[in-house]
Amino acid sequence: MYCLQWLLPVLLIPKPLNPALWFNHSMFMGFYLLSFLLERKPCTICALVFLAALFLICYSCWGNCFLYHCHDSPLPDSAHDPNIVGT
């Protein structure tokens, strides 16, 4: 389970509030995971545990899935705040 110490923090990285950055974020996360899996070659149990956690987060539309944005889940209230200046 040593491999999970590098995989589990990936699930805690928040998605950006700006919808224009979602594609860039998902591409970065996808390439990070792909390069990690190719370079470190985690054990089968760690890979299955991580993929199960990723599937459950994305299937539940919890809002932190970096693969896609669930259409049923609304944007956070701070995304519509005009006082926040986007870059």
Swiss-Prot record:
Family: Belongs to the BLCAP family.
Coiled coil segments of this chain: none
Xref: PANTHER family: BLADDER CANCER 10 KD PROTEIN HOMOLOG (PTHR13259), BLADDER CANCER-ASSOCIATED PROTEIN (PTHR13259:SF1)
Signal sequence residues: none
Membrane topology, record value: Multi-pass membrane protein
InterPro entries on file: BCALP
Keyword list, A-Z: Cytoplasm, Membrane, Nucleus, Transmembrane, Transmembrane helix, Tumor suppressor
Compartments, as annotated in UniProt: Cytoplasm; Nucleus; Membrane
Pfam families noted in UniProt: BC10 (PF06726)
Keyword Transmembrane carried by entry: yes
Segments crossing the lipid bilayer: 19-39, 43-63
GO cellular component, one term: cytoplasm
Top-level taxon of the source organism: Eukaryota
Full protein name: Apoptosis inducing factor BLCAP
Function statement: Acts as a tumor suppressor; induces growth arrest at G(1)/S checkpoint and apoptosis via RB1-dependent and p53/TP53- and NF-kappa-B-independent mechanisms. Modulates expression of genes involved in the regulation of proliferation, cell cycle and apoptosis.
